[in-house]
Amino acid sequence: MNAPFRGIDKLNEVYFIGIGGIGMSAIARFFHTGGVKVSGYDKTPTVLTKELEASGIAVHYTANVELIPKKVDLVIYTPAIPAEQEELVYYRENGYKVVKRSDVLQIITESSFNICIAGTHGKTTIATMVGHWLRHSGFGCNAFRGGIAVNYGTKF
């Protein structure tokens, strides 16, 4: 198993296996808006993958080692991807840094100031409001929410 990745600020290119999930697509947007080249695989085109493509992120829908980039700094996968998925196997067997989505979220939060919203109801609404206020107050921010914010059309 790979050691946790550090050096998130030094990434040039990141590849996602399972990029079309709600959480993975948000992390892909995070890196993309930060100037990192992002691409990925998902088995099915969806509204989320089409939005990623429209923003300039390359997505392919066939698991095929011939289609994957070979000069990536980091590979991120979701546990929904089977361990024997051929792209995941290729990257692991060839010494690439391969990490789970949850590990990347940990690294992102460890390297920044965070405001966390907890509770039973209204977390996405409150997180969207706080993120919106900070973004428009001049402080700026990134926000990972539990659901898609209508005014931003994304979880990120």
Describe these PLM feature segments.
Residues M1-I57, K71, V75, T128:
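ATP-dependent carboxylate-amine ligase
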Residues M1-L11, N64-E66, D103-I107:
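A short, basic/flexible loop-to-alpha-helix module at the beginning of a structural domain
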Residues G18, Y61, G119:
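Pocket-edge structural micro-motifs
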Residues F30-T33, E53, E66-K70, P79-F156:
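Phosphate-binding loop of NTP-binding sites
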Residues K43-T44, A63, G147-I148:
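Short beta->alpha linker loops
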Residues I57-N64:
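N-terminal glycine-rich dinucleotide-binding loop that anchors FAD/FMN and/or NAD(P) in oxidoreductases
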